[in-house]
């Protein structure tokens, strides 16, 4: 399990085409990717399971906890990205709810675009 940031501070100012915004690149892949939105409600749980392939979880709203061993949990909040390798066991839970985007693909390299979270 690795942690990354995709918050505003890790982005780049874009001014092309008279634009004025900050964009944080997240991932690029040449292989098929599955992208979904997860809505965990109050006391929501994504049960302990093995990642079927590389998986990137992007926290958009709310807070939660992630674990790879069901003993030590790490807090996640908006702007955090969590990466699990294929076959890595993990669990995600939230006391008050969270919304996240999940990206699954055989070809994920989040460190190519996002800084590691320290």
Segments (PLM) and residue ranges:
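Conserved short histidine dyad/triad with adjacent acidic residue
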Residues: 34-51
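Short acidic-glycine-tyrosine-enriched beta hairpin
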Residues: 70-86
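Short beta-strand His + acidic residue motifs that chelate non-heme Fe in jelly-roll/DSBH
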Residues: 46-48, 66-67, 84, 89-95
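Glycine- and acidic-residue-biased ligand/ion/polar-headgroup-sensing regions
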Residues: 52-64, 69
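A short, N-terminal "cap"/entry segment at the start of jelly-roll beta-barrel domains
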Residues: 1-33, 116-118
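A cytosolic small-molecule/anion-sensing beta-strand core signal
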Residues: 60-61, 77, 96
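Ligand-binding loop in jelly-roll beta-barrel domains
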Residues: 86-110
């Amino acid at each position: 399990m690795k942690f990354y940031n995709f918050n505003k501070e890790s982005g780049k100012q874009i001014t092309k085409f008279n634009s004025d915004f900050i964009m944080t690149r997240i991932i690029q892949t040449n292989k098929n990717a599955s992208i979904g939105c997860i809505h965990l409600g109050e006391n929501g749980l994504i049960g302990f399971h093995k990642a079927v392939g590389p998986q990137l979880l992007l926290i958009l709203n709310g807070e939660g906890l992630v674990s790879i061993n069901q003993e030590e949990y790490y807090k996640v909040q908006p702007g955090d990205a969590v990466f699990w390798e294929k076959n890595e066991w993990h669990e995600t839970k939230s006391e008050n709810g969270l919304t996240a985007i999940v990206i699954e693909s055989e070809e994920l390299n989040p460190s190519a675009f996002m800084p590691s979270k320290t």
